Amino acid sequence: MARHSFFCIDGHTCGNPVRLVAGGGPNLQGANMIEKRAHFLAEYDWIRTGLMFEPRGHDMMSGSILYPPTRPDCDVAILFIETSGCLPMCGHGTIGTVTMAIEHGLVTPKIPGVLMLDTPAGVVKAEYRQEGQYVEEVRITNVPAFLYARGLTAECPGLGEVMVDVAYGGNFYAIVEPQEHFRDMADFTAGELIGMSGALRKALNAKYEFVHPEKPEIRGLSHILWTGAPKHAEAHARNAVFYGDKAIDRSPCGTGTSARIAHWAANGKLKVGDDFVHESIIGSLFKGRVEATARVGNVDAIIPSIGGWARMTGYNTIFIDDRDPFAHGFVVV
């Protein structure tokens, strides 16, 4: 029997939690972060469930673990852990992780103000603005984002048949726009959106296959993005992103914003250099931009950037005790 100890720095990015595991993470094998992610899931997923699920975490909990980079052009590697699994990329998690890692001296960048990040989804550039000891803003240049499919349909409890477009921004997103049975996310409570989202995601994954054109290890639709008219004067659009078993992102969602930018660009609503301000369900904003065009396999793509802020909320030494019947956490659905 053993008691495993993890030192965590807790914070949030624009309202959504980030738990940076600064001590106690396992050593991982693998030539790259995709292989290290696979090793973690095969042998150490109990750490993710123990730190993210109740009673040590909650439905919206999201986190990260830092590792030495697997490639010479990066400063640090990040493994993302969430209630929904080990995501290839997490935008809000990156902004929070960079903020807390720089403020606490966990990473020394080769170039001040810039961190090159080795993630399972690929290389992500993070530029940060520091004033004194605090990081005030982080802008990430994400992996290529693209429209994956148009006009997919599935049955959704409470709505009937729903049509979605699917875009990739580091994860696959089903984007629900206004249609016969859905006008605006504002017509529903967060609980109602959660109730519909799990069934819709399950139906779409059962009916269609979602595989990254260049990285077949990245597969499956993980998020539902409900859209709405903006309430904030600066925002171009509003969203509520469902992930995990019953979570709605409190931030505008970094990879979701990337997917939305790619969707708008594919529909001719954005071009290189255009800004896109995305509003969350609680009114916080991410400031996105189309940085460049790209290709992913045979698919047209864009390079998005996302700007946002994060704040630390405290330190947390967490024990996972083998004697605890809930050592590996639980979820109440």
UniProtKB/Swiss-Prot annotation:
Catalyzes the epimerization of trans-4-hydroxy-L-proline (t4LHyp) to cis-4-hydroxy-D-proline (c4DHyp). May be involved in a degradation pathway of t4LHyp, which would allow S.novella to grow on t4LHyp as a sole carbon source. Substrate binds at residues 91-92, 223, 249, 254-255. The active site is at residues 90, 253. Belongs to the proline racemase family. Keywords: Isomerase. It catalyses: trans-4-hydroxy-L-proline = cis-4-hydroxy-D-proline. InterPro entries: Pro_racemase_fam. GO terms for molecular function: 4-hydroxyproline epimerase activity; trans-L-3-hydroxyproline dehydratase activity. It comes from the Bacteria. The keyword Zinc does not apply. This is 4-hydroxyproline 2-epimerase. It holds the Pfam family Pro_racemase. The lineage of its organism: Bacteria, Pseudomonadati, Pseudomonadota, Alphaproteobacteria, Hyphomicrobiales. Its EC number is 5.1.1.8. It is an enzyme of class 5 (isomerase). Signal peptide: none annotated. It comes from Ancylobacter novellus (strain ATCC 8093 / DSM 506 / JCM 20403 / CCM 1077 / IAM 12100 / NBRC 12443 / NCIMB 10456) (Starkeya novella).
